[in-house]
Amino acid sequence: MEWVLAEALLSQSRDPRALLGALCQGEASAERVETLRFLLQRLEDEEARGSGGAGALPEAAREVAAGYLVPLLRSLRGRPAGGPDPSLQPRHRRRVLRAAGAALRSCVRLAGRPQLAAALAEEALRDLLAGWRAPGAEAAVEVLAAVGPCLRPREDGPLLERVAGTAVALALGGGGDGDEAGPAEDAAALVAGRLLPVLVQCGGAALRAVWGGLAAPGASLGSGRVEEKLLVLSALAEKLLPEPGGDRARGAREAGPDARRCWRFWRTVQAGLGQADALTRKRARYLLQRAVEVSAELGADCTCGPQEGNGPSLFWWSERKKDELLKFWENYILIMETLEGNQIHVIKPVLPKLNNLFEYAVSEENGCWLFHPSWHMCIYKRMFESENKILSKEGVIHFLELYETKILPFSPEFSEFIIGPLMDALSESSLYSRSPGQPIGSCSPLGLKLQKFLVTYISLLPEEIKSSFLLKFIRKMTSRHWCAVPILFLSKALANVPRHKALGIDGLLALRDVIHCTMITHQILLRGAAQCYLLQTAMNLLDVEKVSLSDVSTFLMSLRQEESLGRGTSLWTELCDWLRVNESYFKPSPTCSSIGLHKTSLNAYVKSIVQEYVKSSAWETGENCFMPDWFEAKLVSLMVLLAVDVEGMKTQYSGKQRTENVLRIFLDPLLDVLMKFSTNAYMPLLKTDRCLQLLLKLLNTCRLKGSSAQDDEVSTVLQNFFMSTTESISEFILRRLTMNELNSVSDLDRCHLYLMVLTELINLHLKVGWKRGNPIWRVISLLKNASIQHLQEMDSGQEPTVGSQIQRVVSMAALAMVCEAIDQKPELQLDSLHAGPLESFLSSLQLNQTLQKPHAEEQSSYAHPLECSSVLEESSSSQGWGKIVAQYIHDQWVCLSFLLKKYHTLIPTTGSEILEPFLPAVQMPIRTLQSALEALTVLSSDQVLPVFHCLKVLVPKLLTSSESLCIESFDMAWKIISSLSNTQLIFWANLKAFVQFVFDNKVLTIAAKIKGQAYFKIKEIMYKIIEMSAIKTGVFNTLISYCCQSWIVSASNVSQGSLSSAKNYSELILEACIFGTVFRRDQRLVQDVQTFIENLGHDCAANIVMENTKREDHYVRICAVKFLCLLDGSNMSHKLFIEDLAIKLLDKDELVSKSKKRYYVNSLQHRVKNRVWQTLLVLFPRLDQNFLNGIIDRIFQAGFTNNQASIKYFIEWIIILILHKFPQFLPKFWDCFSYGEENLKTSICTFLAVLSHLDIITQNIPEKKLILKQALIVVLQWCFNHNFSVRLYALVALKKLWTVCKVLSVEEFDALTPVIESSLHQVESMHGAGNAKKNWQRIQEHFFFATFHPLKDYCLETIFYILPRLSGLIEDEWITIDKFTRFTDVPLAAGFQWYLSQTQLSKLKPGDWSQQDIGTNLVEADNQAEWTDVQKKIIPWNSRVSDLDLELLFQDRAARLGKSISRLIVVASLIDKPTNLGGLCRTCEVFGASVLVVGSLQCISDKQFQHLSVSAEQWLPLVEVKPPQLIDYLQQKKTEGYTIIGVEQTAKSLDLTQYCFPEKSLLLLGNEREGIPANLIQQLDVCVEIPQQGIIRSLNVHVSGALLIWEYTRQQLLSHGDTKP
């Protein structure tokens, strides 16, 4: 149409100057400039044919260029690309720019003045050099793209080079402003799409300049411009890669660049393959594909120079190995394309091809890499970073399995990849989950593969590489945030690496950093196990000649002894053996060298560090100084005990004397100092501190954790040594505590130390027997009296000083220690039960009395000028002094707790208090309780424990008379507990104390008796605890364990009515019986790994060192069930409790059933119902007939509800047991079959299953004939039911019933014999392999009918483990019988054999009866080396045909049809399927598109196309543009003012609902599978995507095109409608 218009204009006016002048007048609209452009192009064509005016035309062109186009472009360049333009919208501005640029190119050609082109280019280049944000940069790009082809390669060569350099810098992001990412990206896209393709056509100088800018070292991968570089490279791929063709083409291109030979090019491609942006990955794949195709077509050898001096090239080609190379690269590209999807079922079939890549890549003859291994790493990196976690896991497993079947040559890339992307992928905890069907407590499959891989890989590493690799591996474990599970399995894998001298001091420090930094917040058991593995790693991999014993001891201190390295564990023994073997090979320690020991010896080292430790330094002067840190004492004690045990290994049979001698050698310096404590008054204070610290740590560390703790010689000898120093130490401590020597804030830590030592000494003497003449006895008595005296003297009201107040705190702490010691050890009772001075003093204490804070100036007089300033600054602050006061109040309540426990019988229970009490704190309990509430508001959460202990004594006494006060104590205590939920160290002790006072049996009994507010408050707190336990595992365990234990004790001590109070709290047992949350995957994973560690038993030292707290949810139910098993059905209170619980369980079942009619398997509803019926089965033996008579209807009714399989089995089982024990209920059972078929539906199967066990039901009935007759009548009716399942169950019941009838030989049934036997025979002999016969065989083999015996299988193991396992219940619900036996808080019932299954049922597997064929085909398929067919994304880059005159085709088609309504062009050249093309053709015709572009016009003859197009192709212009011609076609349309719009999901795609279509729009649709190829994406002006809400995120290309065509049409209709009057 444009050409027709140009012809008409020229025919009317043959003077081009007049015509062009007319067009150059008026407003510079897009339409005017476009008309000028196509008129100039028409004149240019005539000039080329020689028919134009020779003189007038060049002059006219010069005038148009100088007088109109150049000023127009300058005015457009004067405004910034993103700035406001009052006259033109952005899209119209771009349209004007492109039309003006194309017109300018025609003017330059017509004018015949190359200097004009150069001048315009110089001017535009200046704008570009000013940066992309400068005004006119976008216009400058259009000008350069227009005049570039007119520049002369030789004369304008320097200019071309400068333009090319500037363009490359802009395209690589150099034109951005740093913080302006958007403009820089726009510049890169515009320059790469418009300017660079034009420049590389201008000759060798420009092309070399472009390639030089891309391949320069400064533009290498390290600059981080991968996306921009790939944008440019894919745009210029045709010029940067050799042109396949004849010799002439090759000769012409010899001087041109060949990107295949540049290693930077390939590194950029590899980096692109691993980018997060899908479009960047697509461009990288395109470049790889083009390079491979070019290499195959050229047929010439090619090698890319390696980045390093050795190893294979990044890319090479050999014509001799063309087939193998093509096979490798085709598979490689196929895998990379397939990985773009997220569907695992599409990707998994392609993974075997990855194994083939390794076969191609490694030479079997030389054992070296043929292809650079970095290509394989790109695939794995892509898999690791996939959005699909299943694919990530598949990728990790595939990589870890590499060395199982093949040995790959060493490559540095492999090692770097393991340290980098692989370890990053391994940091994902979900990878370590159990496989389906794998039992709980087994090791993670991925953990095992990781261990096997690491062991194999390190064994194959060259010796010189192993050390650096392992060091990097360990350092990587500290370089990021790691969760507990990955660190555990990485540590386990390292621990299994065979012994090798690989690590030095750096490795030891790296291991220490892992423990200190990475694992500090991990779960305790996982952290402990990981520490064990890291110690084993150190022992296996340490080169002892590079480290000293000092280094080793410092590393050992990083291990927490309370979590991993405990004496007596297998790990301790292993460490001792390692030290024994290597002690003479360690590097000499600085300590040993300083005392003249050159030969390394563990004994010498330990002796030296003890001497150094005990020896006082010159700076240890002054009394008011900090107490030393505990680190050194821990280190010395650890090394002493290790050395003693190592010596014991050397002389295994020498006995106690040898141990005593060795210990004496080590500890003589310490013992000498300790013996002088009481006589040397001038001994430095720090020296005494350190010696006492060492004493404590030696006693604590030497305690064995294993089973042989009773006969430990080391511990005995050590205790004897220290007992000999008791008198000296106790005299010293007594002096320090009572003689006003502790008078500064820093001395409070010393007070704590002294009291701990005194407690240890008391324990030592108690072990050997308490004697009244013992020095400790005298010291305790004197300490008690002196402390009381100090406290009484300081109440005189004098002005407080720091010294006096500190002594007051010290005296109260000492008194608290004495009270605790007396309370815990009855042997220490110094006085009779009559109240002595201690009791009288404690009872009259002013509770919660705040210590008055001394004045600051007075404090400073006590301060040492250098050593204590910071401590005193803290004490002078409110917070610092507050801590001291809180400790004082805490110690007061410790003493009071002792007093209340001792004299609890004197506490009055009535509201009236004694007028003149001799023990006020005891005999005035209300006042004491009020003080306790005040203390709870003052004390921090880690100091409330003694207050809770006091409340435990006070609350039962006052609950009746002062209920409101007791309720207030409940509330305040619960507030403290609920705020503590994240503080592990103090939470559990406080919770235990809280439970003991709120749920004390006396409190529960009184509250239930009066039924006041306290009763309801206790129940409220009970439910809050249960609610908290859903978040914090183990909370409910504490409550249920304590209550069950207290009820058991009360039941055994008191006769009738002993459990009556428990009946009032049966909800607690009910909730315990059905307790158990559905954990998130991450929580379940941690629990699985913890179970795995626990199952390791003694092999993992963490299990020995840390006691099993039994905080799993299972133990709540186990506790409740074991409690129920202890109840006696003949005891009336027990019987009432059981019956009340049974009714509540049935209520719960009905409530769950009503809340959700349908529920999925293993949901919380399913689990709760399952637990209800498990508990009812446990209770059944204790239920009598009268009670069952009231609930039997409810049990039968439960059988009619829609239940999961496991619940059905339990209901059927309990019905069988009831009918067996009480046949009187059989009439009600028969009634269940007459409810009406519509009401029953398939639930009748439950009762038919019960009927199949009629032999068990009638076992104790002498007359069975009537029952059998009734059963046969019922069953035969249901054998004719229309439902297949019902018939199947009825036939099984019939078969089993008929077997019983035949055994009894009842004559009345003879008439039925032919009918029944023929029916059963017909069922048995069903022909064929249909479902009916299979299901008949399966139901007969089903465990419930074939193996299960309702009486013999009645045991806890069947109820809680075997039946849930066989019925397909999730493993979380399986409770093994071992857990029942391990839980010792509640004792075993008398008939323990009732717990265990004695039948064959326990040996059955779920696979014996359930269908397990799902997934077997997948397993077989995974092992196949090749797949016959896979889904492949097709890239249409192969076909290359000669260019056609596209515009003539369009003219011809349009002229023939004479129909064009809109200005929309739809390009579908990339679409392959005729169905999609036919549908698009129809849609385009309906909405009036101007033209549909297809890849081949032959498609219109396809029947599928015709079927869907319904003759639309006859009314719509069709143009053929083959895929290789698309770039030229799109460039042409751009110059005609079209906006190129792509339908593609990219990072910068615009939402279709937000995009406004220009009138001249070209819509480019992508291929069905691959989308729009990378080389076309940069031709797009904009990408539009359709907003999607679903999961698949992919629309059919025809549907996508139709949506955009309609949106374009809708917008145009609206805009035209708005312009109408």
Curated annotation (Swiss-Prot):
Q: Give the E.C. number(s).
A: 2.1.1.34
Q: Which residues carry this modification: Phosphoserine?
A: 1442
Catalytic reaction(s) noted: guanosine(18) in tRNA + S-adenosyl-L-methionine = 2'-O-methylguanosine(18) in tRNA + S-adenosyl-L-homocysteine + H(+)
Q: Which residues bind S-adenosyl-L-homocysteine?
A: 1543, 1566, 1586, 1588, 1595
Q: Give the SUPFAM superfamilies listed for this entry.
A: alpha/beta knot, ARM repeat
Using the UniProt record, name the top-level EC class of this enzyme in a single word: transferase
Task: Give any Gene Ontology cellular component.
Answer: nucleus
- Recorded family membership: Belongs to the class IV-like SAM-binding methyltransferase superfamily. RNA methyltransferase TrmH family.
Name of the molecule in the record? tRNA (guanosine(18)-2'-O)-methyltransferase TARBP1
